[in-house]
Amino acid sequence: MRRIVLVGIVAGAVVAPVADALAGPRAHETACLETSGDAGNACLKSYVGAIERCRRAPDATCESAVRADGGALDEALGDTASPVMRRCADASVERLGYLDLDDLAFRIPEACADFAEDLLDIEFADDLELLAPDALRCQRNVVRSIRRLRNTVVRESGPRCFVRAFDGGACDRARRDARVSRERGLARGRILGRCGTAFDALGLASLAPVSSTLEERVDELLGVVIDRGHHFAQRVYPPNDLGPTADFGPFPVGVRTLVLADATRLNAGGTGPRPVLTEVYYPSTAAAVTGMPRDIIRVFGIPITETPSFRDVARAPGRFPLVLFSHGNGGIRFQSFFFAAHLASHGFIVATPDHHGNTFVDAALGIVDPASATNRPLDMSFLIDQFLAFDTTPGHFFEAGVDPDRIGASGHSFGGYTTFALVGGSFALGAFTDPRVKAALPQAPSALPFADDFFASITVPILILGGSIDGVTPFPANQQRPFDNLEPGAAVVGLAGLVGAGHFTFSDFCEVPRELLSFLGGFEEACEPRHLPWRHAHDIVNFLSLNFFDAVLNGDPDALARLTPGNLAAIEDLVYQSH
């Protein structure tokens, strides 16, 4: 296959209609987008790198300093070359990898017209030049059509939505989607009308099953274009600003892996104690992380993404609340590092165990725990036992680190079930209540194992999170029904519905490269253009989670006030109910 790059439309044309709206703090982004080739890549790398470093630094003035006249971002822009088309060196392609864009597009070394062009190219047949004139005309039509569609998606999902919202405006996503849908229809009509069966001669049939119709193959191609453009815009443009409790906190975050085993229970093979491999995110110090690389998550040896945490660095002194997080069915302990690292940056210790026999790594190895529904809550109680033991063990890393009276639990999907089980009464599988857990935050939980009266037995503060288009644990049966049967009386008894969120919106699955997602599954439950942008959704989850645990475990009245229905009504894409 030969790669034909879609060139000729500079990124400046994408953002020019909203240039005035991007004045001030957004000007650096605009300048990067208007700069072509290697220089544009370097510019955006400097922009993203400087801002992200600031947002993870304890100095609150860092970001304003790098944005100031003559600051680091102005220096980056001063180094950019004139916008000319040039070949992309391997290093340029790697810059896109630094931006974590490699999973969003077909990466190309052949040419750089501007950095947005690097996000999309199409593999045409090697012998395209030998084809009939109608196939060549079709190829030119396809290039023009998908370029226009891509630019529409980036414009509508980027400057017109995220930047306006970030600057206090409103993003009309229905209008955005309508514009994209209209351009998609025009592209579809042009390709089908001017190509016909010549489309298949371009070598694009691999994008759709062989048995599909021509219309389905064209639709698949256009879906790829929309997906790449939408996710590119999410990466470049920041989501809505919900205030400091949605932002990274004052503590740099450390992470370490604890290799634990529960001798009172057997592993899935019955050959030894049950392993409880656990990732722990904790508050660190600026001195401890200086010069240290950020932690990189790897699965099967494949580097997935860089995290905001630093491995095995020193812990900040003092006692902190403990929050346990239970992953979903077939998930893994670091599936929601965005959530764990956020809480840790605000002064929580967050322990996220692997549930042995119920991770996707275990599944690949043929390790299955048929009793996972009962073992999961026992894993969580075992972890509490361990941390309380660490607390009084001289010389242990977590000695005097956890406040035993401030313990909360959260979990996603099957982990949401686990959270319910820890704070409710008995049900068909038994009773797993752990009175040490003082607050519960189930995320897109599975509630089907529980009868209605089970939820009336929950007396601790609880905030249930769910997505309106969750196809795995649908909202009415798994989030609304539990909430409807909860009794009022606790400090917080709430239900937060994220409009447009899917099941895996509450995880970091959209950070995973697509080729691995096809193995894991989940793309269609979080990462499609129809979904609430996952970075904005994560901001909402972090805002709700931090204020909930701050209000309940730390007794913070300001945090409790932020969770009132009146205040939460101002958050776009959130529907909140309370008892």
For the regions a protein language model found, what residue spans apply to each?
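Soluble, non-transmembrane alpha-helical interaction regions
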Residues: 21-239
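Domain-level recognition of soluble alpha/beta enzyme cores
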Residues: 240-324, 335, 527-534
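Short substrate-entry loop that stabilizes the transition state in hydrolases
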Residues: 287-288, 305-363, 471-476
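Conserved alpha/beta-hydrolase "nucleophile elbow" surrounding the catalytic nucleophile
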Residues: 327, 411-417
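Short glycine-enriched nucleophile-adjacent loop
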Residues: 388, 416-431
